[in-house]
């Protein structure tokens, strides 16, 4: 095993409680670096909605939480470079590499496998190299759960299953503007162009802005919903039209825009309101709906011509998800195969400056001071729980 520095034996981490909340834990064991893993010293972490929801779904004490991180590789398992070299775009890892990625936090099968800590044992498939010029906070905000989950929703079999050969072509091109997607005006949409329109509900979320970018790169025409104050934001990330989800006529406006021909919708929220609006916006012939949350059955039963699905990003680790309340899932080898091809592709797009980060808000001291980062994570998770974060990604610096 290659190692850069001597790691401590214990660390501070943010862990789950039996009551479905979070707490700071000191003296936690620093995970070892398995033969197919890399050990990363964490520099910054990003907070996601799933981070505050997971403790209630596992109802277990002492699981390290957190998904998205950026940091420095300090050790590499002897087989850690084998699997990435079998990917479509091969990569390798070495001590000292600056990386960003995702782990399956709050994981009953791997209690120490969470990002809200000082060190994390990471799956090399789910990592990307940090581009030159990016700081740790920007890298953590991109992480891996957002672009991975969104890509699986958009392009994965059984979900929207959109064609992304155009996106791959752009990644293979050395020119930053080699392929462009000039979306037509709605009044001039042909039938084929109408089938390229995709609704992204929640376009001002981190998942939303990522979806807008990926859709444009893949040659689709994204429309979205958000508050009017965020119309400029979503348009800057690629939306060709934005609709106010507060409006009683929102679904009607989208049906008019798409001439009742919308066939694909990505729901970044997955609640009753968002699902109902997506279903109402889809055209008379139905289509596909995919959510980043388990959608309500009361909505999915309303239209038989709509094929619904929902995605949990951790399925891309190829492991069983041991969760409560209907969220448990068996190991998904197809999702794992998708991840093997997707993460190297995403890395290339990031390094080519074709994908950019969501707006970042730094939470906690910067530069970090002692263990105050852990308290900052707890405060940030409460903000997410309260719904007080809008059009921004909370990022906490962990180490200088």
Swiss-Prot record:
Keywords: NADP, Nucleotide-binding, Oxidoreductase. Pfam families: ADH_N (PF08240). It is an enzyme of class 1 (oxidoreductase). SMART domains: PKS_ER. NADP(+) binds at residues 50-53, 204-207, 227-230, 245, 292-293, 389-390. One of its GO terms (molecular function) is nucleotide binding. Monomer. This is Trans-enoyl reductase ucsL. It comes from Acremonium sp. The lineage of its organism: Eukaryota, Fungi, Dikarya, Ascomycota, Pezizomycotina.
């Amino acid at each position: 095993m290659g190692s850069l520095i001597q790691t401590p034996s214990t660390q501070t981490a943010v862990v789950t409680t039996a009551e479905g909340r979070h707490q700071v834990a000191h003296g936690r064991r620093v995970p070892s670096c398995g033969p197919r893993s890399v050990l990363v010293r964490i520099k910054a972490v990003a907070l996601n909605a799933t981070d505050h929801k997971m403790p209630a779904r596992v109802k277990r004490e002492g699981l390290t939480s957190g998904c998205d991180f950026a940091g420095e590789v300090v050790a590499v398992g002897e087989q850690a470079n084998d699997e990435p070299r079998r990917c479509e775009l091969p990569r390798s890892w070495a001590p000292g590499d600056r990386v960003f990625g995702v782990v399956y936090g709050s994981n009953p099968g791997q209690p120490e496998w969470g990002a809200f800590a000082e060190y994390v044992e990471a799956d090399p498939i789910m990592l990307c190299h940090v581009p030159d010029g990016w700081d740790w906070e920007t890298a953590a905000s991109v992480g891996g759960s957002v672009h991975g989950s969104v890509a699986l929703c958009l392009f994965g079999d059984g979900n929207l299953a959109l064609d992304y050969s155009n996106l791959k072509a752009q990644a293979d091109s050395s020119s930053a503007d080699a392929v462009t997607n000039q979306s037509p005006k709605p009044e001039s949409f042909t039938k084929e162009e109408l089938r390229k329109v995709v609704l992204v509900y929640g376009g001002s979320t981190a998942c939303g802005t990522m979806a807008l970018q990926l859709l444009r790169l893949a040659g689709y025409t994204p429309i979205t919903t958000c508050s009017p104050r965020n119309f400029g934001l979503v348009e800057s990330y690629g939306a060709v039209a934005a609709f106010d989800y507060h409006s009683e006529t929102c679904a009607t406006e989208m049906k008019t825009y798409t001439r009742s021909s919308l066939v694909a919708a990505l729901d970044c929220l997955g609640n009753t309101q968002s699902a109902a609006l997506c279903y109402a916006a889809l055209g008379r012939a139905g289509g596909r709906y995919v959510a980043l949350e388990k959608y309500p059955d009361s909505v999915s039963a309303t239209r038989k011509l709509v094929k619904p699905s929902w995605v949990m990003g951790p399925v891309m680790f190829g492991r069983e998800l041991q969760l409560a309340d209907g969220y448990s899932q068996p190991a998904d080898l197809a999702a794992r195969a998708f991840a093997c091809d997707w993460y190297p592709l995403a890395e290339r797009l990031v390094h080519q400056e074709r994908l950019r980060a969501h707006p970042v808000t730094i939470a906690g001291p910067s530069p970090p001071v002692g263990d105050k980062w852990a308290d900052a994570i707890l405060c940030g998770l409460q903000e997410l729980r309260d719904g007080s974060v809008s059009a921004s990604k909370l990022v906490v610096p962990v180490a200088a």
